[in-house]
């Protein structure tokens, strides 16, 4: 089952989430929206195992990276109808 990984614009470019990910789902890409001039990106979500280590590593008050497990995504989509 595939999980959804969302990166929010509150990312400060610290790379903590990228280093915490055991399956290399995340990488840093150039972005002018923060002081670090980079932001996390999730190009390989199919490799996400749902461990949420990236969430735990995020130092921002509002988590900049969130993992939505496949069953959480399915449940929330059902509420939209």
From Swiss-Prot:
Q: What is this protein called?
A: Photosystem I iron-sulfur center
Catalytic activity reads:
reduced [plastocyanin] + hnu + oxidized [2Fe-2S]-[ferredoxin] = oxidized [plastocyanin] + reduced [2Fe-2S]-[ferredoxin]
Provide the cofactor note recorded for this chain's UniProt entry: Binds 2 [4Fe-4S] clusters. Cluster 2 is most probably the spectroscopically characterized electron acceptor FA and cluster 1 is most probably FB.
The GO terms this record gives for MF are: 4 iron, 4 sulfur cluster binding; electron transfer activity; metal ion binding; mRNA binding; oxidoreductase activity
Q: Which cofactor does it need?
A: [4Fe-4S] cluster
| Protein's cellular compartments | Plastid, Chloroplast thylakoid membrane
Assigned GO CC terms: chloroplast; chloroplast stromal thylakoid; chloroplast thylakoid; chloroplast thylakoid membrane; photosystem I; plastid
* Domain 4Fe-4S ferredoxin-type: residue ranges: 2-31, 39-68
Record's subunit section: The eukaryotic PSI reaction center is composed of at least 11 subunits.
Q: Single Gene Ontology BP term? A: photosynthetic electron transport in photosystem I
Where does the chain bind [4Fe-4S] cluster 2?
A: 21, 48, 51, 54
Q: Whose protein is this, by species?
A: Arabidopsis thaliana
Membrane topology summary: Peripheral membrane protein
Q: Does the keyword Cell cycle apply?
A: no
Annotated HAMAP family: PSI_PsaC
The enzyme's E.C. designation: 1.97.1.12
> What is this protein's gene name?
psaC
- Keyword list, A-Z: 4Fe-4S, Chloroplast, Electron transport, Iron, Iron-sulfur, Membrane, Metal-binding, Oxidoreductase, Photosynthesis, Photosystem I, Plastid, Repeat, Thylakoid, Transport
Q: Which InterPro entries match?
A: 4Fe4S_Fe-S-bd (IPR017896), 4Fe4S_Fe_S_CS (IPR017900), PSI_iron-sulfur_center (IPR050157), PSI_PsaC (IPR017491)
Report the PANTHER family cross-referenced here: PHOTOSYSTEM I IRON-SULFUR CENTER (PTHR24960:SF79), PHOTOSYSTEM I IRON-SULFUR CENTER-RELATED (PTHR24960)
**Residues holding [4Fe-4S] cluster 1:** 11, 14, 17, 58
Q: Which NCBIfam families match?
A: PS_I_psaC
What function does the entry list?
Apoprotein for the two 4Fe-4S centers FA and FB of photosystem I (PSI); essential for photochemical activity. FB is the terminal electron acceptor of PSI, donating electrons to ferredoxin. The C-terminus interacts with PsaA/B/D and helps assemble the protein into the PSI complex. Required for binding of PsaD and PsaE to PSI. PSI is a plastocyanin-ferredoxin oxidoreductase, converting photonic excitation into a charge separation, which transfers an electron from the donor P700 chlorophyll pair to the spectroscopically characterized acceptors A0, A1, FX, FA and FB in turn.
């Amino acid at each position: 089952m595939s999980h959804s990984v969302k990166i929010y614009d509150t990312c400060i470019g610290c790379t903590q989430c990228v280093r915490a990910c055991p399956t290399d789902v995340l990488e840093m890409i150039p972005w002018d929206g923060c002081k670090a001039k980079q932001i996390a990106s999730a190009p390989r979500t199919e490799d996400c195992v749902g461990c949420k280590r990236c969430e735990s590593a995020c130092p921002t008050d509002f988590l900049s990276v969130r993992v939505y497990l496949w069953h959480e995504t399915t449940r929330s989509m059902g509420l939209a109808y």
